[in-house]
Amino acid sequence: MEASAKLTFARLSPRKTRLVVDMVRGKGIQDALTILRFSPQASAKLVSKLLRSAVANAEQKGASDVDRLYVKSISVDGGPVLKRFVPRAMGRASKIRKPTSHITVVLADKQ
């Protein structure tokens, strides 16, 4: 049985978030949450929250044993980029890019 969860429009850089996501891909739920708990990256907190949401979704779907779940797939896609301007000297302006991410998690039972 599979359960999934999505986080959309997260104000995180997709490039930096992929570094965190790669650490937990294919791991068991307890191992993944432990890795994320001790990870210093800002995206680790949101990814662990998303994993817990996926586990809750699995329980709602009727998963018999939550401890047997593992991260089957987890992906980070780029969302829209918020563009802002900051004033600079002599009437100029510089562009500030604020990237967003879409994170998708799929959990499955170990066979």
UniProtKB/Swiss-Prot annotation:
CDD domains cross-referenced by the UniProt entry: Ribosomal_L22
InterPro entries, per database record: Ribosomal_uL22, Ribosomal_uL22_bac/chlpt-type, Ribosomal_uL22_bac/org-type, Ribosomal_uL22_CS, Ribosomal_uL22_sf
Molecular-function annotations in GO: rRNA binding; structural constituent of ribosome
A Gene Ontology term for the protein's cellular component: cytosolic large ribosomal subunit
Q: Which family does it belong to?
A: Belongs to the universal ribosomal protein uL22 family.
Q: Quote the subunit structure annotation.
A: Part of the 50S ribosomal subunit.
Could you identify this protein by its name? Large ribosomal subunit protein uL22
Species for this entry:
Geobacter sulfurreducens (strain ATCC 51573 / DSM 12127 / PCA)
Q: Which gene encodes it?
A: rplV
